Amino acid sequence: MASLPPHAGPATPLSPTRLSRLQEKEELRELNDRLAHYIDRVRALELENDRLLLRISEKEEVTTREVSGIKTLYESELADARRVLDETARERARLQIEIGKVQAELEEARKSAKKREGELTVAQGRVKDLESLFHRSEAELATALSDKQGLETEVAELRAQLAKAEDGHAVAKKQLEKETLMRVDLENRCQSLQEELAFSKSVFEEEVRETRRRHERRLVEVDSSRQQEYDFKMAQALEDLRSQHDEQVRLYRVELEQTYQAKLDNAKLLSDQNDKAAHAAREELKEARMRVESLSYQLLGLQKQASAAENHIHELEEALAGERDKFRKMLDAKEQEMTEVRDAMQQQLAEYQELLDIKLALDMEISAYRKLLEGEEERLKLSPSPSSRITISRATSSSSSSSGVGMSVGQGRGKRRRLETEDTSGSPSRASRVSSGSRLAQQTVATGVVNIDEVDPEGRFVRLKNSSDKDQSLGNWRIKRQVLEGEDIAYKFTPKYVLRAGQTVTVWAAGAGATHSPPSTLVWKSQTNWGPGESFRTALVSADGEEVAVKAAKHSSVQGRENGEEEEEEEAEFGEEDLFHQQGDPRTTSRGCRLM
């Protein structure tokens, strides 16, 4: 623009219109300067842009070549990894079949050992019975021997008593003979005394008559009354004398007869008692001999039975020792084979883990390259490549503690949730959209031999499994379940319920329509449903109140934003691939694998 000429004359006052035009000219000058500066800046930026476009084209060529090489390498590595995975799966199936066979053989060996142990227990019980019978027989024999000795002592005493009784009997016979002789003698003496008495009586009567005659001669002169009195007194005195004499003879005879009869009765009674004692002693001696013979036969039979039982026990012990040695050798061989199988599986798992790590590194590198290319295409406003959509899937495995053979296999597939963004490169305006999805995370923990094998999302049943080789008592145990933030519900087992080794039990809700069939199928009649939902917590609580197994699931939502640009599509999937990990490996606690 042309500048104003200098004013030669004196300064004149400027009008407001003049002043406004001068200000507008000054503003236009400044704007022209700014426009020229902006044009220079635009030209410099265009030159820089051309230079950057040239560099970008060069980078694209280099990147295309590198991506093609990496893609070829990745595809070959992926094919090798898939081949190794297929071989690993086949090898794992073969090893599982072999492990099943080994476990079946081990179970048969255990059953055989249990059977042998049962036979040994029965034989030991029989031996104990025979030993107790033998000891009882020995005790009875000792008792019989002591009884025999006592009986022999009694027999000796009875024989002594019998000898004494026989001696007494002989003495009694002799005494009886003496008494008989004495009786005869006494009878003779009595007869003699009677004869003497009769003679004395006759003599006495003769004397009385003589005395009476003398008195008659003397008392011729006595008064007749006095004579009668004298006769009466004389007759009375004679009568008294006669009665006294008869009484003495009678008393002597009675006493003699009583003494003789008493001695005779005593002798007969003593003889009868001696005969009875001797007969009883003979009978007892006969019975004792019979009992001794019977006990001797029983003792001989028991000794034969004990000898046969000892021989059988010895044979059973030898057979059991042989079976134990055979079973121990088989068990050692099986354990060695299982150790080799575990080592082989561990080696394959290590190789598989290395392949997964390599695959994860390749996935991350390819993802980084693609993000870099998409950023350059977006900045340079180039058309996106046909493969602008990226899909990332994660496979996670939850480790659960179990007491099996030593391997823990993740089971069950979670539900798949996706986050997708559509390609909006053809739209003239830049739009902002939000896409939402959900994620389901599950966790299973078991500290004992019984774990929670399966929980129905619809709340129809809960299944428990005994993964050990021993029976587990679940008396008064409870299954507690809580859905979201609701109240706890608990199912309580009966006091005598036992879960067999390797078996499962399913507790159905009453609304599921299942049939109550213990011990594998139980129906909770007071509860129509366990509570449906994908976010829950189920716990197995022992009778002491300790949680021995827990299975929890949490359902969460995720969001992704798209601002007129093409972003990633993320696919979260639990159990996308079956990942087999050695139990106790710390790497299996929480590990993810990204797959193209």
Swiss-Prot record:
Record-listed cross-link Glycyl lysine isopeptide (Lys-Gly) (interchain with G-Cter in SUMO2), residues: K59, K173, K233, K465
Glycan attachment positions: T391
Location of Phosphothreonine modifications: T12
Coiled-coil intervals, chain numbering: none
The organism's place on the tree of life at top rank: Eukaryota
Transmembrane segment boundaries: none
Assembly mode: Dimer. Lamin dimers then assemble into dimeric head-to-tail polymers. Ultimately, two head-to-tail polymers assemble laterally into a protofilament with a uniformly shaped rod of 3.5 nm in diameter. Interacts with TMEM43.
Official protein name in the record: Lamin-B2
Organism encoding this protein: Mus musculus
Gene: Lmnb2
